[in-house]
Amino acid sequence: MEFLGTTQTASYCGPKKCCGLTSLPAVQAPVIQECYQPYYLPGYRYLNSWRPSLFYKISNVQTCPDESSSTLRPPTTLPALRSALFSRYSPHDWDQSNQLQVRGAEASRLWASRLTDDSVRLLQDKDQLTQQMQQGTTRNLGQRLSDIGFWKSELSYELDRLLTENQNLETVKRRLECAANEVNCPLQVALECLYHREKRIGIDLVHDNVEKNLIREVDLLKCCQQQMRKLAQRIDLQMRDNRDAQHALERDLDDKSSAQCIDEKCFNLRNTSDCISFFHGMEKIDGTISVPETWAKFSNDNIKHSQNMRADSIRLREEAEHLFETLSDQMWRQFTDTNLAFNARISEVTDVKNKLQTQLAKTLQEIFQAENTIMLLERSIMAKEGPLKVAQTRLECRTWRPNVELCRDVPQFKLVNEVFTIDDTLQTLKLRLRETQDMLQLLVMTKCRLEHELAIKANTLCIDKEKCMGMRKTFPCTPRLVGHT
């Protein structure tokens, strides 16, 4: 039997038999402050099964059934002393544990001192950071107000120019409408001239230069009217686009004014202001729909769109002024050409009428002479009948001569020759009488035709000179043709 107190070569210091002990229960992680790291004492003989610590509870050890009871050799030590012998430390472990405690305390104090210094510095840094952030935000709000003011001035300037351009465009539109209505008067005059000239008679219904100029004048006036009205319609559409651009500028300007009021209110807020309060979660809500680039681009696009609309309006106004100048010049030139054609035609008709009157006078003279000639021929024929009767009577009487006295003597020969001569003379005179009568009939017909032609020419002169030229004495002046009333 071995006694207590022997060396470690004793049987109770030999290899420990497996007793089938259950493992320690799992412990819950302790709730400790940040940066705290638990430490443990060194030593392989450290037993958590019986020694309580700061973070573990004493676990109940369930002993396993004695497996050695079945062996023949009894235990060499008492069970009550075995746990006490196994739980003892060496002096080295004790010293090392004390040193660790001291070093742990010094580390804790050093960490606490550093934490205190870091906390002071953190407070100073965070106060300075908060103040700098607030000052920076205030500066940003001021810069934002400056940007808003800049774009407001740009939008206001562009809006004023657009409104002025709209007024100018409205004036040009009214001028176009007035000029188009003013063309109705000369157009009606030209149409009336064409209607009156349709009342010409006979050969005077000619497609002359006057009619060509009148048709060109009507077409030109209608074309001018159509061009003015089309341009007025284009200007009306442009004015709609201008109003859209104007509404966009006004909306943008109103939004900028509202944003400026809000940002001015935010700019003037201080830590001591009465109207400040907590609005938790506002930093997590992103209700923005633009960034500074797109924000500036939006206003810039509105201004560029307005500038494009103004450029289109200026081009339309220049086109309208050019159209006024061109059309008024064309209408005046065509009106003058038509009047010149009228004057030339009236002169031609007057010349022809004078010639016809001259021919009529000569025809009447020829008729008078023909009638005298007929009268002389009739008298001459009647005068030749007496000698013919005498000659024929003489021949008839000489036929009663008896027998050989019926001689073809010189008197007989002369009488026969006289009868033939007088008869031939009568036939010639009668033929000339018929020719003269035919000529007289022709002259009478010519006189009728001349009188008819003179009546036609008089009607033509009345239409062209009195009716048409009477209406064409006046023409709208240039200021009225360009829309100035």
UniProtKB/Swiss-Prot annotation:
It holds the Pfam family Tektin. Ubiquitinated, leading to its degradation. Deubiquitinated by USP16, promoting its stability. Its main location: cytoplasm. One of its GO terms (biological process) is cilium assembly. InterPro entries: Tektin-like, Tektins. Keywords: Cell projection, Cilium, Coiled coil, Cytoplasm, Cytoskeleton, Flagellum, Ubl conjugation. One of its GO terms (cellular component) is nucleus. The keyword Cytoplasm applies. It is found in: Cytoplasm, Cytoskeleton, Flagellum axoneme. Residues 113-185, 225-251, 342-385, 423-443 form a coiled coil. The keyword Magnesium does not apply. Microtubule inner protein component of sperm flagellar doublet microtubules. Interacts with TEKT3. Belongs to the tektin family. Sperm-specific microtubule inner protein (MIP) part of the dynein-decorated doublet microtubules (DMTs) in flagellar axoneme. Forms an extensive interaction network in different conformations that reinforces the helix bundle composed by other tektin proteins (TEKT1 to TEKT4) and MIPs to anchor the tektin bundle onto the tubulin wall of A-tubule of the sperm flagellum. This is Tektin-5. It comes from Macaca fascicularis. The lineage of its organism: Eukaryota, Metazoa, Chordata, Craniata, Vertebrata. The gene is TEKT5.
